[in-house]
């Protein structure tokens, strides 16, 4: 068990975006988190990564309480994440995006950095080679020297994943990785995610596109900020409540 | 990955430095031409008249801009008048004075730069001006480089004029002159005034000028109500200060130095707040301006010691001519003079040069400080200031005292506003 | 408590009220433009100054009726607003550095232009209304009363304009979501030009009134500008109602602080107070969301 | 802020040749600058150069803070702070001007750090405004200290760095200081620190998600910027002998950002060129007396409308234009 969310609640001025959420994530699994628009999936991510503070409840990562820590602290502990919208540094090249995402392992202190000591140079060389590897992994190697903002949507999303991998996460939160992609982009992405999880990274996916289910070991369905059901993709597909929850809601991207 | 396009940036750096090079080459050229040289001109006199360049330091831009543009015009008129009376005679040779004007941008460092330009670029040996406290930027420099410096005004702040600035003279009535004039008149004509409030701009002069004023007021037998009220020159509304003045419960308030805007506004606000206390304004701005700001109904029961203005009997024929020429220049038949703050020093300079019969600043300063009486645009003036400045180098002359009732200024008398 | 003190307190209260209304009057155009259109007009002070000078010129040199002169000044400066929108704001929308550069350029031209052209004469627009208004021991000049009334009524008018009229609603729509507004068929350029016209007109109105209350200098806009920014940020971005309260706070501080401390220290203390307020309420008193 | 160049020297051989051209260029420029006193004998022109050097340090440090997305409108006030601290220390306390110079820089840095902790929460516009207010307040505060700072009239006859009246030693020392400061700032910008600042500027959300502490780096940026502007202020005070608040007032604050913006915020050379051009051109036209400001205004308009990314973008524009001419294929893109 790598992540344990218990009783997590977030109220935005009265109405509860997330209420009494209990989820446990096991080591090395791929957990799907699905639900219609406004179900509170992204809010949940922001709560886990400390972008917003929960009203109550706790988030425990590897037996360590990380509730309400600052985002960069949580990142240092090894939780990487991607963003739905503009997930990158638009004015850096693709490679620079990944390089500048290497902040934690290795990290050179200010002294080394300023005086360009061997330590710093060693680290940067290592980082460069690592970055190129990651770009190979997510299949962005060929566009590595182009400005990130000029890349197609799918590439930008993949770059988001690459950046998240750069912090060597043990837990990776992917926020709608395939939203707005065309079919073969989707296939590439799913391939990349599979490869990533084979590296032993635990993954939580937020998606309200059912297609993603096929790579999940376990799926949690939430609606109105609450967990409806939980189970294997197969069970979920048959579950009447899920069908019901999905009937009303369109498939366009969340807010 | 591409390195920053530094060759390109460098080309532009070189480009910029080339531009700079050109521009400054231009500067040097002008320098060589405007340096105190001998360009011969033919006039009525027998021998050819040479020209001698005098530096004028004015704040042509910034918040003093429009004001100093006017005073520089006066200065030019004064120069013309000196030249038309045969210029100055040094070593039997007639010289016409020629002004080279530099802009101090109404900032202290701008003034320093301008002074540097006058001294090192225009190579002048005599500097007139600048205005107000900006002298502090010039006096030290002139002392260092042995340049004769005749200030156009003085707010008595450190560095402007003291025992160490032996080359600096005060050629024009300053805040201290106007104050002494007003105080003397007040003492003589308003026996029932016992307590006075003091108001002045809080431009840093309070610890110096303010302290001196307070001493003089007490020496004259008045009690100062409360502490000195320092107002912010750039306040939007002066009524808080007015309220503060009224709250002191003094018989009279003396507004020392400052310009028409704050003084007039305070007068207006004091009256609007329902107080009719005696209001004494002592600064160079003329009564009519103060009335303009304060409004006719509000400006009453006011004593004003100011520069000469339209309506006061002219002390000297020169001043009459000055006024006529100025009105001709601005094309307004009843335009008032501003303050002559540069014209007066120039007029005096002509006098001093003739006396000293030399252009050497060292000689000039000795002659100047040893003159018993000097010819100013306001008539004969005296040289004093040992008690106030530590050096005997401040010119003082008679100033007009005016009373204002219901917006009508009435000239009272000429006060010999001596600097102690 | 001695009578002098009581008088002082009463006077301060009156001053605070009047000064606040002045500041509201000054800040209205600026805050309107920023809150509704997200346009930061750093040249507001200079425009205010120009309005004052036009009114002065028409009223004295031309000898026109004062109120008529004011109206013409307002109209003329309003037209200048179109120019501003087209050449200063539209090309550089959202880039604060470039807006500052352009605005400084405009300020330099206007201020020095006036300074050079007017020469040195102390200039005051004759008072719009004469006389002093007395109630018991309190006495104010009618001028200040008029400024007070005009300031408040203009605020109300602007609020009505924003909330009730079609154009006002369109402006808010544009400010909130440009693309949406365009899709709705709103003529964005027209709307923003209208906003600039209104803002500049308000500035000119303030200028003409204040020009008769204070005397005119080419640089009268500079200190005003800081006040106006204080009021904007204090009131909170995206809220016109904030102007009322921010104006009250700034005005009261300006009316009371000079009585306690002397001269320039007032400004320092004032800034300190404002910064502290803003650190506790970073969005300003009535701020909704951050923009700019 | 557009970002160019690589964070690390890519380990391929031809970078050495790549680095050679700028190196030569730098050498040329430095030699040119070193020769200036030999070309221009007039102390007045040296005076202008010296002031330019001081303002270049100030503008460059301001731009460094701006790379992190903060617009420090208080920067001119910090210049003033540095100037006043070193002036007071060397005049009233009697420290050696050199020591005062360093202390001024350190004090300025400390104040910068102190304010940037509370201000680090604020986003772009609010930061700009609050720093503007802080600048005004700081200056007014200094002004209101009475005899210590001499109010509006400022401090005069400040002890100078050299006893000699000549300006040549000042020029060389300040040139050296400027080059060192710029080198340090450039190093900061080109190493990971600078890149993290740019990352924060582009998206503080994303940068925090990879472990960049926004507060830490914003504070670092302000600290470094304020240190150098404090140094510049100290140099200014001890060279210029007289200082007054009017030199650092609101107009000055806005002009400072103009130095940066006209030169170009996207490039390290921007503030250098911008300052050189904008400070010296009006001096050249100072013969126009009260009409001089119109010249600077004209320059502003010309630059901002012609090259909105500043003067440094000129070569790039020329190059792209040239390439467009060459490749007629993609005329429709861009």
Language model segments and positions:
Chain A
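Glycine-rich phosphate-binding loops of nucleotide-dependent enzymes
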Residues: 1-255
